[in-house]
Amino acid sequence: MTEAFKHISVLLNESIDGLAIKPDGTYIDGTFGRGGHSRTILSKLGENGRLFSIDRDPQAIAEAQKIDDPRFTIIHGPFSGMAEYAERYDLVGQVDGVLLDLGVSSPQLDDAERGFSFMKDGPLDMRMDPTTGIPVSQWLVEADLDDITWVIREFGEDKHARRIAKGIIAYQENEENEPLTRTGQLAKLISDVAPKSFKEKKHPATRAFQAFRIYINSELEEIDTALKGAASILAPQGRISVISFHSLEDRMVKRFIRKESQGPQVPHGLPLTEEQIKALGSADLKPIGKAIKPSKDEVDENTRSRSSVLRIAEKL
């Protein structure tokens, strides 16, 4: 890994401690990235421990293949396939811990050719796995005003969503303009159409770029499926540690843990026998502690950790 694309794992010790690693346990790192969390988990495992790591980014897979360790298995695919992978390796009900480090990694942001950053000019792509799906540039050509507005508002929580969407549509309808294929073009376009007051707080393209990335990679659907999959494959007392980086992700994780810790909700006064109530099932998880945020020292060392939140839950 080059120094330029170095990745600093966020909340590393806290997330690993949250898994309560057993030396002979079986663990899944749903987001290998550049291997910071995976390597730390391996360092805590004994010779009978096992780690399965997942990533859909081919560059992450290439990095993972450098690990020569019989206890380690890398799986190329989305973490939404976690339950399927667990069945493939006969792990259902035997996994002692799952770690999910959500969002985009520093190497993905720093590599202009991946098209994630509005700070560096590159192809307007944003796919976690460039071998599947379509790039943002193609989607913007095919989308209409309402589509673009909805994505920016829903996944970027940007109050200027329609204004930005109108700017994008107007740009593309002007035949004198070059096709919108570069991150630099899109960042400038958004900056040009954003209100002046909006520009003073942070780069006006921040939320729109986040929105397009989340949408093009189906990130929220992936997270929802991965959380359900993780809960279904954990052994009793198995742990799940989830690091999120923006409010949409954290709300999903928080609500999932809350829902799974409450069990089925039976309307008050509904005439059910004790056997019928038992048949509905019970709580599946319990939250461990409160949400954890990075220390001031970590934020000073890695400003990208500033918005991160760690939540931990245990299988009942």
Curated annotation (Swiss-Prot):
GO terms for biological process: rRNA base methylation. Its EC number is 2.1.1.199. The keyword Methyltransferase applies. Residues 291-316 are annotated as: Disordered. It is found in: Cytoplasm. Disulfide bonds: none annotated. It is an enzyme of class 2 (transferase). Residues 294-304 have a biased composition (Basic and acidic residues). This is Ribosomal RNA small subunit methyltransferase H.
